[in-house]
Design a protein with these regions (language model features):
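A short, charged/proline- and glycine-enriched loop
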Residues: 2-9, 50-52, 142-150
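Short beta->alpha connector loops
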Residues: 59-64, 82-85, 110, 129-132, ...
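Catalytic binding pocket for nucleotide-activated donors in carbohydrate/polymer assembly enzymes
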Residues: 7-16, 22-36, 40-43, 113-121, ...
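Conserved catalytic-core segment of nucleotide-activated headgroup transferases in glycan assembly
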Residues: 20, 131-192, 259-260
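Short, charged, surface-exposed secondary-structure boundary motifs
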Residues: 86-93, 114, 134-140, 162, ...
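Hydrophobic/aromatic beta-strand patches that form the interior of the parallel beta-sheet core
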Residues: 56, 77, 103-105, 124-126, ...
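Short hydrophobic/aromatic-enriched beta-strand-loop microsegments
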Residues: 78-79, 122-129, 175
Length: 307
């Protein structure tokens, strides 16, 4: 039997709270689903990896960068979901320096451009979109009639607090989950809300793809502060209603006051998601990295990265 086969991938979510969902859980699920739809075998693992496999790691810097060193760098891809270049951004320059030594997939072209100029080239940095997939809506929570006008799941900042005050002054009801919620933990709040809101924390204002995922799949309209879009996943072409900071409250009112507009928003977003092209970006990246060549996929043991 020929021991060489098409490459097999594994999404490695570093999550100190597993099996509860956390920051990267939704993105990890969508990546697994998208890679499978592209025609490749792909598993999703929490806090462990097959050391001879091709790993795509989420949360490496935050929850286990030392542990990730146990993996072969030439078979390990770091998926960056942070906003690079913001003066107040976590985790800042040390993280960028760490990324320069690795293979990186990134959700946004703005981050790629920054790394290309500061790292002297882009040969190991690739834009790969996070595409919403139906698995995010299979949490077992049945749809219900909306009870809350605005769902806002985010950490606190003065500009966000000001928007919440303005929404309340406009007579809107708000469910602000401070610090955020994720995956199945977010689902109950999602299904009882008329709209989901995004207001930026960092001045880079990169379009927050991960904040769109579950709302897009569950059919909840989204209002977002104006964002810097990216070529492979330009949410301005969807039904998301973008507005400048001072116009966010009015944008929320526009959707909340009109069930017809909310329906149109959802339909446009679902159409947009259905047309997003993941496979091409993924194939281009793994071909450039040489991962489409045959390699041994014989049995090997998993390594727990938190042990």
């Amino acid at each position: 039997m020929n021991p060489y086969h098409r490459p097999v991938f594994q999404i490695v979510e570093l999550n100190p709270y597993a099996p509860r969902p956390y920051v990267f859980t939704e993105a990890a699920s969508c990546l697994r689903d998208s890679i499978r739809l592209a025609g490749y075998a792909c598993s999703l693992r929490n806090n462990e990896a097959d050391p001879r496999g091709i790993s795509i790691v989420l949360g490496a810097w935050q929850f286990g960068r030392t542990m990730v060193e146990a993996l072969d760098r030439n078979r390990t891809i770091i998926f960056n979901l942070e906003q690079l270049g913001a003066t107040d951004a976590f985790p800042g320059k040390p993280y960028e320096d760490w990324l320069r030594e690795r293979i990186v997939f990134d959700y946004h072209a703005g981050n790629i451009e920054r790394m290309a100029t500061t790292a002297g080239g882009r040969s190991r940095f690739f834009e790969v979109p996070i595409v919403p997939t139906p698995s995010l809506a299979t949490s077992g929570h049945a749809p219900s009639a909306p009870e809350v006008d605005v769902l806002f799941f985010a950490s606190e900042s003065p500009r966000r607090e000001e928007i919440v005050r303005r929404l309340q002054a406009a007579g809107l009801t708000i469910d602000w989950i401070r610090g955020g919620a994720f995956g199945t933990d977010l689902a109950p709040a999602m299904i009882r809300s008329r709209i989901v809101l995004n207001v930026h924390y960092y001045q880079t204002r990169l379009a927050p793809s991960t904040r769109m995922l579950q709302a897009a799949v569950r059919g909840v309209p989204i209002v977002s502060e104006t964002s810097v879009q990216t070529g492979r996943c330009d949410w301005s072409r969807s039904g998301v209603l973008f507005a400048d900071y001072d116009d966010v409250v009015e944008a929320c009112r526009t959707l909340i006051d009109s069930p017809e507009r909310r329906l149109q928003s959802v339909q446009r977003t679902l159409h947009f998601v259905a047309r997003l092209e993941f496979a091409l970006a993924f194939e281009e990246a793994i071909t450039a990295l040489g991962f489409t060549t045959a390699y041994d996929t014989g049995h090997f043991a998993s390594r727990n990265l938190f042990s």
